[in-house]
Amino acid sequence: MAKELAAVYADVSALAMDLCLLSYADPATLDTKSLALTTGKFQSLHGTLLPLLRRQNAHECSGLSLELEHLLENVADALTTLGVCTSRKLSPEEHFSLLHLDITCNKHRSVRFNFYGNWALELKLSLINDVEIFFKRLSSVFYCIGSGSALEGLGEVLRFVGKLRGISPVPGPDLYVSNLPCLECLQEVCLTPNQGTSLQAMLPDTACSHICTPACGEPVRGLFENELKQLGLQTPESIPTTPCQSRVRQDDEIRQSSLMAVGDHHIFGEVTRSVLEISNLIYWSSGHSDATCDGDRDCSHLASLFTHEADMHKRRVDLAGCLGERGTPKHFFDCFRPDSLETLFCGGLFSSVEDTIESLQKDCSSAFYQQVNYTTALQKQNEFYVRLSKLLAAGQLNLGKCSTESCPSEARRQLVGGDKPEEVLRDAKHRQELYLQKVARDGFKKLSDCIRHQGHILSQTLGLRLWGSVIYNEASALQNHFLHRAQFISLPWQDLTVDCPTRFENSKYIKNSLYCQRLGREHVEILTLEFYKLITGPLSKRHTLFPSPPNVTLAQCFEAAGMLPHQKMMVSEMIWPSIEPKDWIEPNFNQFYSFENQDINHLQKRAWEYIRELVLSVSLYNRTWERELKILLTPQGSPGFKEPKPAGLTTGLYLTFETSAPLVLVDKKYGWIFKDLYALLYHHLQLSNHNDSQV
């Protein structure tokens, strides 16, 4: 079924991409007949597939099925809107305003979640990152909310995600931020060597590439110029050559001449001193070649880029005449063209955002390098090229001079000393020159690194990104967890949660038997890991070939949710080596997993106490009566869900995290719901004795 679903998703997403492009095209160029035919075919698919897909997602979902449901809804709405706009014969400005410039904003949502203990959360959503952060936090407290309330709230959150998804594979730049790490970023950081650095210090420097995945776009510069050449049209002049570019070409020519001079040398040949000198100069100058690109220049790279953009727009008139069209088409970017400042953030039609960032970097470096100190540093750095020119022009090298010469300064070749005033002044001046050179050289390197780093940040922020799979995968994992809980407790189990004197006496018998027992220290350590495993959220449970230990998985779950250190300390102190039954056994009868009105912090701690009691009491019960009762979680996608009496379920004690039916004892095809742990243990003892007697 997954293959068929993926095939449908591929076709629907391709249609969504085409429809997204058509919504920005000149309405006069649209084929209304083909559009109407496509709309009819899609409505047939929409009416057949969408109801079945919703039923499937209400039973068990995947990231692919959730996204496909949203695409079907959004494409249907977009086709209807585009059909209405084309039928009304609007002007291009009115057409695009109706499609894209609607003043109503639907990118904000408030969702209410009702937890146990009558504690409610009013969730404010604006970005995709808000949804992902909430998923991680809900995963860390999944045992504090009922499945019904969780599914109701998750439905609202998914509808909000569907609105953000739209039909474009490119999310809007106002829908996400890339400097907030997601759960996948945390997993990657945990696998990299940290050299003693904490996760809190490493995660802020992480640029998330999972929620919205960076895409390597096709180069735009030169693409349309090549199309004009193929049509036989004269292309506009390229970006004018500047003195900076002339110098760069000159430096490149020197480098190529140097490589030609040593090109005749091979591995079996003799290494002459001239070849060795040229090779060393080429090597040592290669690390600084990028810093010499932006010296003195007369015009801005950004100005040249904008000029080229304007020239290419003018050539569209010639292109329209060549194709026999009446005037140029009026697409969206013709009616609402961005100004120069907006182009810095969105790029142009004939240049990409990467081209804009590169030009901005060059202009910034030019402004810095025009300072006197950095100009001197550049000149000294270009001595490599000067020496290469002399070596190639002279024909014969002065080997002794070239191997020892490093600076023409006379002060570097004479010793400074003596007590005469002029010698002391000369020494001070020499030291001042060396200090200024060092400061200029270090500052030059720091400026280059800073410009490069800021350019990388701009590329990460403004670069092309596509919708990732993280949001839908996390949504499906949480949705399935609560769906399975709701489906499991809805099975025809026998309800034994009502107060009964017999079960009360049975509960007292088990408690009195456990009070005089004790767990070993080595046993407590194993049970602590089992406790950690039960309170680990569904998003942090990974089924891999090399699973992490339960304590590591729980730590990652809490770290992803942003839990504070004192809260983590409380978890670690729930079970200690010398713990005794009186420390965890609750005296109340039939009150297991019941919560009073309190906030989420007390709810969470109370849930930990219940789960601790379950783990330790069951273990002590097994040890005392030599039983093998296992603690299990609600199964995922069990084939027995549709049967009157479920088959194929493992015998054991199921923890559902539901206040109405927290404990379910399953034996073969039968099951019983309990609200008292020790009454359940007595019932299991009777069942096991009965089974042993039959054997």
Curated annotation (Swiss-Prot):
Keywords: ATP-binding, Host nucleus, Late protein, Metal-binding, Nucleotide-binding, Viral genome packaging, Viral release from host cell, Zinc, Zinc-finger. This is Tripartite terminase subunit 1. Its main location: host cell. ATP binds at Y621, N622, R623, T624, W625, E626, R627, E628. GO terms for molecular function: ATP binding; zinc ion binding. It is found in: Host nucleus. One of its GO terms (biological process) is viral DNA genome packaging. Belongs to the herpesviridae TRM1 protein family. The gene is TRM1. Associates with TRM2 and TRM3 to form the tripartite terminase complex. Interacts with portal protein. It holds the Pfam family PRTP. It comes from Human herpesvirus 8 type P (isolate GK18) (HHV-8). A zinc finger (C3H1-type) spans 182-210. Component of the molecular motor that translocates viral genomic DNA in empty capsid during DNA packaging. Forms a tripartite terminase complex together with TRM2 and TRM3 in the host cytoplasm. Once the complex reaches the host nucleus, it interacts with the capsid portal vertex. This portal forms a ring in which genomic DNA is translocated into the capsid. TRM1 carries an endonuclease activity that plays an important role for the cleavage of concatemeric viral DNA into unit length genomes. One of its GO terms (cellular component) is host cell nucleus. InterPro entries: UL28/UL56.
